[in-house]
Amino acid sequence: MDVHTRWKDRLPVGPAAVPPLLLLLLLLWAPPQSRAAQPTDLLEMLDFHNLPSGVTKTTGFCATRRSSRGPDVAYRVSKDAQLSMPRKQLYPDSDFAEDFSILTTVKAKKGSQAFLVSVYNEQGIQQVGMELGRSPVFLYEDHTGKPGPEEYPLFPGINLSDGKWHRIAISVYRKNVTLILDCKKKVVKFLNRSDHPIIDVNGIIMFGSRILDDEIFEGDIQQLLFVSDHRAAYDYCEHYSPDCDTAVPDTPQSQDPNPDEYYPEGDGETYYYEYPYYEDPEDLGKEPAPTQKPVEAARETTEVPEEQTQPPPEAPTVPETSDPAGKEDDPGFGDYDYVPTDDYYTPAPYEDLGYGEGVENPDQPTNPDSGAEVPTSTIITSNTSNPAPSPGEDKDDLGGEFTEETIKNLEENYYDPYFDPDSDSNVSPSEIGPGMPANQDTIYEGIGGPRGEKGQKGEPAIIEPGMLIEGPPGPEGPAGLPGPPGTTGPTGQVGDPGERGPPGRPGLPGADGLPGPPGTMLMLPFRFGGGGDAGSKGPMVSAQESQAQAILQQARLALRGPAGPMGLTGRPGPMGPPGSGGLKGEPGDMGPQGPRGVQGPPGPTGKPGRRGRAGSDGARGMPGQTGPKGDRGFDGLAGLPGEKGHRGDPGPSGPPGLPGDDGERGDDGEVGPRGLPGEPGPRGLLGPKGPPGPPGPPGVTGMDGQPGPKGNVGPQGEPGPPGQQGNPGAQGLPGPQGAIGPPGEKGPLGKPGLPGMPGADGPPGHPGKEGPPGEKGGQGPPGPQGPIGYPGPRGVKGADGIRGLKGTKGEKGEDGFPGFKGDMGIKGDRGEIGPPGPRGEDGPEGPKGRGGPNGDPGPLGPTGEKGKLGVPGLPGYPGRQGPKGSIGFPGFPGANGEKGGRGTPGKPGPRGQRGPTGPRGERGPRGITGKPGPKGNSGGDGPAGPPGERGPNGPQGPTGFPGPKGPPGPPGKDGLPGHPGQRGETGFQGKTGPPGPPGVVGPQGPTGETGPMGERGHPGPPGPPGEQGLPGVAGKEGTKGDPGPAGLPGKDGPPGLRGFPGDRGLPGPVGALGLKGSEGPPGPPGPAGSPGERGPAGAAGPIGIPGRPGPQGPPGPAGEKGVPGEKGPQGPAGRDGLQGPVGLPGPAGPVGPPGEDGDKGEIGEPGQKGSKGDKGEQGPPGPTGPQGPIGQPGPSGADGEPGPRGQQGLFGQKGDEGSRGFPGPPGPVGLQGLPGPPGEKGETGDVGQMGPPGPPGPRGPSGAPGADGPQGPPGGIGNPGAVGEKGEPGEAGEPGLPGEGGPLGPKGERGEKGEVGPSGAAGPPGPKGPPGDDGPKGSPGPVGFPGDPGPPGEPGPAGQDGPPGDKGDDGEPGQTGSPGPTGEPGPSGPPGKRGPPGPAGPEGRQGEKGAKGEAGLEGPPGKTGPIGPQGAPGKPGPDGLRGIPGPVGEQGLPGSPGPDGPPGPMGPPGLPGLKGDSGPKGEKGHPGLIGLIGPPGEQGEKGDRGLPGPQGSSGPKGEQGITGPSGPLGPPGPPGLPGPPGPKGAKGSSGPTGPKGEAGHPGLPGPPGPPGEVIQPLPIQASRTRRNIDASQLLDDGAGESYLDYADGMEEIFGSLNSLKLEIEQMKRPLGTQQNPARTCKDLQLCHPDFPDGEYWVDPNQGCSRDSFKVYCNFTAGGSTCVFPDKKSEGARITSWPKENPGSWFSEFKRGKLLSYVDAEGNPVGVVQMTFLRLLSASAHQNITYNCYQSVAWQDAATGSYDKAIRFLGSNDEEMSYDNNPYIRALVDGCATKKGYQKTVLEIDTPKVEQVPIVDIMFNDFGEASQKFGFEVGPACFLG
């Protein structure tokens, strides 16, 4: 390949540089045209010096030039310039040269993109063109149509429209085109033309634009030359446009007429530079050369060659005339730190530069033309290079040597970015960065020839200043090693879109068809909501706007521009190896859509789709009928720690905890109501048996005496003063289950209790607040096989993937500017079908194809992988009432949760009957005798517990006003779940409205900012107690406190002997007024407010806890395969396994409650002397003693538990309206409201937009019961279940056998209250209890066929302990739920606190054993008795079997006190301490999980407008429309040259492949999915709407049969869905019919690029289509929307108009009127529609034809003036004519000459759309006898 390179830095040439013989050959072989190639000056031929219209003079390239009187002269060209010439004038006597140069000095307007010159043949095909702008294009097309448009040489990274002067030289030689820019930068591109191309000489040359092109060159031009020699381009800066410090030769467009050194004779003749040594190597003698290695692929690098010590031998000696040291005025050098030098630089020798032609090479063909066939380009560059110093020179003389400093300076100023980010560009500078500077060095492309060997060393060059050295270009040197990579350039500016390509091939067959109908399931469309932060609701957008947004989204993804320009040139690296092939280019511009592909084959059954994104909540479902309580489901997985839940119902009593260490003494609590009997104390030593004495008379209450030895239990004394807390006694044996005490008053909220055991699954709670998404959980075990879901809708295009491996084709350059639409070529022969191309990127979502015929059902596919756990589904229809399921086995205990909030106390049960007397226990062994201890005073504080966090002493609160107790309201039915609303601002307080129907609980809104402190409210009920603080300083003894809270019932002690029934005691004295209680819990909810307006849809909440299994959903169509998801959480437990072997017997169950009294046994023999008897029955009360002295006030007791909710107080009067507060924090979630009254059925909503894919539906309900399978093997340990709500109490079990007594342990330090340990293994279940009441309704499942109830499942295996949950805040009290079924008996509760003794009653006589009495009323509290001395703990013996109760033994003597025993076991908890100050507000807890959905209410009110349905399938093809009328007259082209019709043109080049055609029809539906587990008719209301389309009509005949099995309602639903889909499709792609009008013709063309020109309906203002109108759509003209003048406005026939005056408007003529316009049917177009049409248009045009006879319409050729030009009145009342409107031009002006009948066609083509259409015309040249005129008004066309 021969590429000639000429630089201003001359090649050094010495005497031995060129062998004389070779020089002689060069001169002899030079053809004549190479010696005198005459340039043609286009500016001269276009008459620029006479300044035609649109051309003015201006200053040129150099403001001052040496040897010149003034600046260079240039011409400024505006948009008004229209310049062309016949091509014959360019080469009058010869053909257009095959190889030529185009030379120009030009400064284009910044940011413009237009053709500087265009050469057309006779057929109007552009054959040569030069486009200026960013990434300029050289257009070339020879007589064979080569190269095609996609192969036009493009020069990316170069910006010629940066508003600066550029000297541009283009050399076309063989199959290369070389661009030399500003004498420094050279880029070579491959030109794929034929071997002997022909350019027609009979066409025209246009300057500044192309035919029918809107872009017109604007800027300054100084020179434009065509030279029939490709080498002239290399000398442009020497001979044609030298630097400003050099005089200009008198060549074309000379600036200085004085002759200079180019003209030795000074005779002024035109001097044309000859090229004596520029010869084609193929014409020279072929000399053999040494074998050369193939040259590596030239890299894109700027090379500074190493110093060459030998000049090339071929270079002849030529005088040098340029002064390379004087570059300061050269605009091309900008702000360079230019290094002047007197030295000359040597490019690499020929051999190193890789000239391979004419050299025999074993690796290359020797055919001299072979180099021209290779589509590669080698670019030779040589910036600067120094020769080696001659022996006499000093090294320092090398002023031009490239030092590091030089390179650094060059780097700093090297990029002179031509791109100005402030230019008219819609891309921000950050997205683009600077373009490639126009003065950057050469870019390499392609593969060079083989590398030659190094030549012999030459002699130093002899150079005299002023000599012009013209050497032939040296061959390319080997590429250097790659320099360091330059910094990545910023992204280039996005190119304009290219021309539309030809239609593509038919699309591939359509995708596989939808999966077959689901197993009698139904999918309803739900709108897809975007996730993310909750934003405000946006405006409703039309379908077209949403489509535009989707297109914009696609475009945004495609906005990534091509790679930016190359980075700064690195320092020269060593030679690099050849690069591999470039990356594959990006896809070309998309052609028009291809024809629809053939219908694809039926698709196979789709795999289950991957889990889609979670959708927003669906539309509210229809309320279902109330269903029965469902069977108990399997234990679910443990949920994430939720936010603080609502206050739960009281749970069952937990088992007693281990004894804690002794706590610090708390303050005395208020005296509570009488508790149940406490546990028995430790057994005393045997005393002598005394007969029971009669009760003595009541004595006076004395002072507490010294404690005597412990005697038998005496009669109940009066309550003494509160004593100090005694040391805890040893733990006694658990007694039998005590009777349930009477209901206590509701105390204050206690401290949070320890977490209880997990209860059975409670009823679904209300939806909680929406929490933030939690962290990803661990992988759960795989769940059971879910049903196959419908495939989701097609997803949006994914983000760009990472770049693939290098491909073959090079990277696509920057997007070119749009090409101009060529004439339609002759249709080519059909090419062979090419190999299938690689898969393209996903296009935007195509319209859904029509359904294909159903295929045969395929075989059932293999079971898919288990899907991830779905999110809870929407409410389903209620199922039928199922039988009550049996209670499942308890699961393994979960791990301890965090301490939960204390629940509200449960309702106390009725008092139980008294148990029978228990058997007497065996006597324990005697304890070790202790050392006698000193007499003990009142016990001191116990051992200090572990230090707690010290709470500050709380101030005593003021006394509160107790509120009256209100009756509890009845529990309301659960309402339906509503859409979560966004939190509104707090409104002003309104009057309390009547209670509205309860709303559905929405998810918790976001936390608002803390509002300002409100005014003090009425005292609330007591609040929950705070955490226990450290004990405060003991206060003075306080007044007697209120009764303390009721203690928990203790375990029953062994029953004592039956005592005498006492009379009911007198009521005790009224206690003193208590201290003010702390703030109570919130009161009962007020009446519900009226329903608010429906809020906007909230953001999608986090994935809720797994719902109970819903009904099995229908199988969905297969989704596209998504990317593999993250490893999902552990799935739910698997299905029941096979029957396992019988397990080992379980551990012993818990002790049962005591049994009924047995029959009385026979009297046994007297037993051995018994141990000390149990505490006797309460004796009769003694008489009341005198009032004791008022004791010191005791320490303040702890807050009691909150009392029961009081009655609703009367509403107070409405207060004054307060100032508006700040929004408060979100309130607690309200209670589930009652279902609203049934509403009317809503009308069918309008079709909404296609929603994105909804979430996968939840799991369907259990299927029909299968046959009992064998016992499955034990499953793996499941995750811990969530804490269930309290189960219903079960029946009492049989009493268990008494366990053996364990030994008493030593007394331990009192520990902190331990957390409840996990429950032991479950005992065998008790007998089945009676059926309980129905529980609360379950949450509705998703819509499905209701399933028959299955039998109770086998109990699942117990899960492992779950991790402890975070501590939740105290919840609000919930409403009492309806009683659940009876639960299993709970374990014994902890021992209750000792109740105060009651007053003594009178002695009764021995009565007969009565029947079990009713529960007695609560007795008054007794005073605390004195504290006895602490006995020594005995050594516990093993528990014996419970013996028959023996008689009471005699009292034994007290044993001697033993030594201090070790600390006893943990005593019961001390009394609650004082309420501490409120601690700091804790961190917000984790958001709670969304509760289960409440049961469906009755039918609601009419719903809001429905969400848009999915896109319907396209309707059947309409009938062939009537052929439209022919289009309006198009704008005439520029005047062509008259000539005979030419021969038929060559076949046009094939355009780029169009986009893939629409997918073919989907195949038949696949086989039905797996059947639903139950088939029942779906309760669908059979209301008919206008969308009622029989679904069978939408199927092919063969397909209809497969739907016959569906329930009656399915057909209607499918018909409605299909109708919705069709309507949405038509909204997205309007058809231009009266019912489905487009917005404009441009809109219609974008949707249907294949529509022909014709009449269509448009509705610019959208909305209702009733006001649409019919227009003519000119798609050929780019989608113009045309309206026509009415019949009377179409014009007037030619006549002389004798009665009218020139200069008057046509509307003032007798036969005239204002012009008005109508649509294609003759109806006037409304003002509003015209206004919208103008708003939607960027330009408008209208033609007016003036038919004349000797009358001027526009220009008067005789005078050259426009004084008589027609004037127009625009729609905006603006007068327009030649003198004030540049947008009117005469396409044909035959009337200018005033000769005979002629016509003038005026075109108004204006961006000021408000001027069009014209409404009146003024004619100015008529009235003489010989003058006539008429006119025709064309349509007004608007282009978007």
Curated annotation (Swiss-Prot):
The keyword Kinase does not apply. It is found in: Secreted, Extracellular space, Extracellular matrix. Residues 561-1572 are annotated as: Triple-helical region. Residues 231-445, 1573-1607 are annotated as: Nonhelical region. One of its GO terms (molecular function) is heparin binding. Hydroxylation on proline residues within the sequence motif, GXPG, is most likely to be 4-hydroxy as this fits the requirement for 4-hydroxylation in vertebrates. Residues 1611-1839 form the Fibrillar collagen NC1 domain. Its main location: secreted. Residues 242-523, 528-547, 561-1576 are annotated as: Disordered. One of its GO terms (biological process) is extracellular matrix organization. Residues 1-36 form the signal peptide. InterPro entries: Collagen, Collagen_superfamily, ConA-like_dom_sf, Fib_collagen_C, Laminin_G, TSPN-like_N. The modification Sulfotyrosine is found at Y234, Y236, Y240, Y262, Y263, Y271, Y1603, Y1606. Residues 1296-1305 have a biased composition (Gly residues). It comes from the Eukaryota. Keywords: Collagen, Extracellular matrix, Heparin-binding, Hydroxylation, Repeat, Secreted, Signal, Sulfation. The keyword Signal applies. One of its GO terms (cellular component) is collagen trimer. Ubiquitously expressed. The modification 5-hydroxylysine is found at K629, K644, K710, K746, K776, K797, K806, K809, K812, K821, K848, K866, K884, K899. Pfam families: COLFI (PF01410), Collagen (PF01391). Belongs to the fibrillar collagen family. Trimers of two alpha 1(V) and one alpha 2(V) chains in most tissues and trimers of one alpha 1(V), one alpha 2(V), and one alpha 3(V) chains in placenta. Interacts with CSPG4. This is Collagen alpha-1(V) chain.
